[in-house]
């Protein structure tokens, strides 16, 4: 039996939110180390099916082991923004009973210094989820203008000292290549602590900047917006969308999307609309039932500090669409 020792955030809450049909078809759009997938499979009968996706080859390699152990499971190497295309090729569009997206960085990506995600571990400055394509963080920092660096730090990291940090990076890269996580972390930390003596020491000074660069390099927010626009086509009537986000930018996108498609336009009384017109207006704007949000318990946060910023939002596709 496949078992992966991994503390998946909001594990039980996410699977409960999917409202598993034992013979249904489900998608884990962010396989990672397989924590959520393993739990979903435990809820399915032999007639059920789970399709996983991940753009990280190391995750796909783990998933391929599971495919040999469980015929109900398959995994695809692709970002979840390509989900509609992949599911179309499998003739399953409109038949999916639930989609789960865990938007957090996998624990193994943070602890593997060679991936370059963490300012706590020295390694090559890469940060790519799929290191077989695209530019690395080092390559981008080496050629990006000061203005572009500032924009990324401010937009994706909400870093108040973005201008000063960008200036420091541009000055330092003229002296030596910023190709290690430790080098970038030191530049950012020195800048933040120099200009802000009252900085909250409980949070590492490089936290926001590393987050911003990672989001930019992997186009993470674009990925989220793309998949959200496709979920209506993918889900079966009554199918569930469950998204776990880990920062305010991600959560804002998910919250806005669900709210936008779970509202009904309120028409003043006595407006002369026929039943058909009302139904058209209603179904054209309301496609989801907003089922709310869930946050980790204090106990889970104590056991897994990564859970402290997690927010789970979920919704159900309306049957009459």
UniProtKB/Swiss-Prot annotation:
What main location does UniProt list? cytoplasm
Q: Which domain of life is it from?
A: Bacteria
Recall the GO molecular function terms of this protein's record.
rRNA (cytosine-N4-)-methyltransferase activity
EC top class named in words: transferase
The Gene Ontology CC terms held by the record are: cytoplasm
For this protein, the record's Pfam families field holds:
Methyltransf_5
Say yes or no: keyword Manganese present.
Answer: no
Give the EC number(s) listed in the UniProt record.
2.1.1.199
Entry keyword set: Cytoplasm, Methyltransferase, rRNA processing, S-adenosyl-L-methionine, Transferase
Cellular compartments annotated: Cytoplasm
Which terms does the UniProt entry file under GO BP? rRNA base methylation
Q: Which InterPro entries match?
A: RsmH (IPR002903), SAM-dep_MeTrfase_MraW_recog (IPR023397), SAM-dependent_MTases_sf (IPR029063)
The region annotated as signal peptide is none
Binding sites annotated in the UniProt record for S-adenosyl-L-methionine: 34-36, 54, 80, 102, 109
- The yes or no answer to whether the keyword rRNA processing is present is yes
According to UniProt, the reaction catalysed is: cytidine(1402) in 16S rRNA + S-adenosyl-L-methionine = N(4)-methylcytidine(1402) in 16S rRNA + S-adenosyl-L-homocysteine + H(+)
UniProt family annotation:
Belongs to the methyltransferase superfamily. RsmH family.
Please name the HAMAP family in this protein's record.
16SrRNA_methyltr_H
Q: What does this protein do?
A: Specifically methylates the N4 position of cytidine in position 1402 (C1402) of 16S rRNA.
Q: What is this protein called?
A: Ribosomal RNA small subunit methyltransferase H
State the encoding gene.
rsmH
